[in-house]
Amino acid sequence: MEIVYVYTKKRSEFGRQCNFSDRPAELHVDILPDESLLSNFIEKNPVDRGIQCVQEMSEHEINTERFETDSRGINHMEGGWPKDINPQEVEQVLRFRKKVEKDESYVTTIQNLASSMEHTIKQNNAIDIYEDYFADLEIEEVEETPSAKTINVFRDPNEIKRPATHLSWYPDGPKKLAVAYSSLEFQKTSAETSMDSYIWDIENPNKPEFVLKPVSPLVCLEYNPKDVHVLIGGCYNGQVAFWDTRKGSQAVEMSPVEHSHHDPVYKTIWLQSKTGTECFSASTDGQVLWWDMRKLGEPTEKLIMDPSKKGKMENAQGVISLEYEPTIPTKFMVGTEQGTIISCNRKAKTPPEKIVAIYKEHIGPVYSLQRNPFFPKNFLTVGDWTARIWSEDIRDSSIMWTKYHMSYLTDGCWSPVRPAVFFTTKMDGSLDVWDYLFKQKDPTLSLQVSDDALHSLRVQDQGRLIATGSNSGTTTLLELSSGLCTMQRNEKALVTAMFERETKREKILESRQRELRLKRQGASAQGQDDDEEGGPDEEEDLVAAAEKEFFQIVQADKKKFAAQQAKLSEQDNKIIEEAEENNGSEKKDTENGEKEG
């Protein structure tokens, strides 16, 4: 539509803007009634009227001041240390402190706070705030029978059940439990068997909270202690993968097949590092591989478990268990299929130097290996039909061990809160709780957890909850009684004395065996020298002397036997003569009696 004509008007002709204000009511028009019109109307009586007996309401709208809200979080680290500083690492702490103390703002702040801090310190020193008013009051110790109760049971949701091969607790409290499911029987899995593993909420056993979907069944699974959303898993085909629960069920990254293990990965452990992305894995192919999650293309380091220290794969022993203590970051230990425990040093320069010590006493695979959290020099191993406690100083034998059980032992671990308590699982589906301060020959508590064999075991860091996984895919969550998860009076000192006593005893036995071994070696060497000097004539003389000595011993035994027979015959003759005399005297007595009668 085209504009035909435009009307133009000046701004000054628009008039003023409206300006409203409050004022009282005014009467402008008042029309009075006209009585002449009254005849036009008729009064109606009665009149129908409708009324509503309710309170009158009206709708009003108001505009209030709007407040904008948003969600914010705060990340508190223990001790106020930065994320990349581990408070347990002495070198990192000292390095960080020196760096901060050189800062000018730090020095200025300390000088400004010195006066107020000094005043506060004087206030604290004026009164002993740590005074114990009831130091002499004896606490009544209530003897509680060791017990445990089942809290929840988590079952494999698939139709074809698989063993629960590994368990891992959520690092930030007893909230979740990650379970790896895999069948380790060779070529026994079908195409319909699921490869999924699950993360369970311990309050909801009906449905898994999260599903992990690997390309191969997971044999082991571990939470990252520094990032609760990240997990590392070892697959049945030898690959290593890690998941981030914020990014879905699929693995974020996997190691390539050509640079991975060639057998199932039985154990993966996170390393104590600044980045929190380093880990290492062990497999029955005889290799231990180190990885960095930021680059899984190939391992950062490799070690072949060859006890001969030659680094040959044909001599390597398959690794089933792996141990790493964060307080000793350079050391780790492995347990092999052949029953050998190998102690290693990662920081050694050459592969032979990395294998430090070898312990051998199990006659079957070492399924579990863990250091005591209170005494790192002592470690627990579980294999064949026994559980054994070792000392690093004694290599020939363990210092303590359990009796041989009727069922095969499958897993074991220490209590994180009591140095004298450890747990073991068996093929008959039972869980044994051992308290070495209470008794050492038998378990303190034995529970029949499942009708199927128990395969895995894990204790929560607070020591109250314990989870076990069975061959049927059932994970049972148990709660221990307070006596089993509360440190007893003087327990640490008593356990220290017990370990030292047993270590000293084994050292004495070891030195005695060494002396006997040297004597036997010396005697055998001397015998060989005599044989070489004497020749065949002396050998014939020795044989003749041995035969002569043998026949002399036989003749002496014959004479001794003949003397014993003669002595026995004499005794028999005496007994017969005495019996005949007694019979004769009895006959005479009877004849005399008849005559008198």
From Swiss-Prot:
This protein's GO CC annotations: microtubule; outer dynein arm
Repeat (WD) residue spans along the chain: 159-210, 213-253, 260-301, 314-354, 361-400, 404-444, 449-488
Principal location: cytoplasm
Subcellular location: Cytoplasm, Cytoskeleton, Cilium axoneme
Region listing for Disordered, in residue ranges: 512-546, 562-597
Acidic residues composition-biased segments: 528-542
Basic and acidic residues compositional bias, start-end: 584-597
Domain of life: Eukaryota
Keyword hit for Transcription: no
GO biological process per UniProt: cilium movement; outer dynein arm assembly
SUPFAM superfamilies: WD40 repeat-like
Keywords, comma-separated and alphabetical: Cell projection, Cilium, Cytoplasm, Cytoskeleton, Dynein, Microtubule, Motor protein, Repeat, WD repeat
One GO MF term attached to the UniProt entry: dynein heavy chain binding
InterPro entries: Dynein_IC, WD40/YVTN_repeat-like_dom_sf, WD40_repeat_dom_sf, WD40_rpt
Protein family: Belongs to the dynein intermediate chain family.
Function: May play a role in the regulation of dynein heavy chain activity.
Subunit structure: Consists of at least two heavy chains (alpha and beta), three intermediate chains and several light chains.
Protein name: Dynein intermediate chain 3, ciliary
Source organism of the structure: Heliocidaris crassispina (Sea urchin)
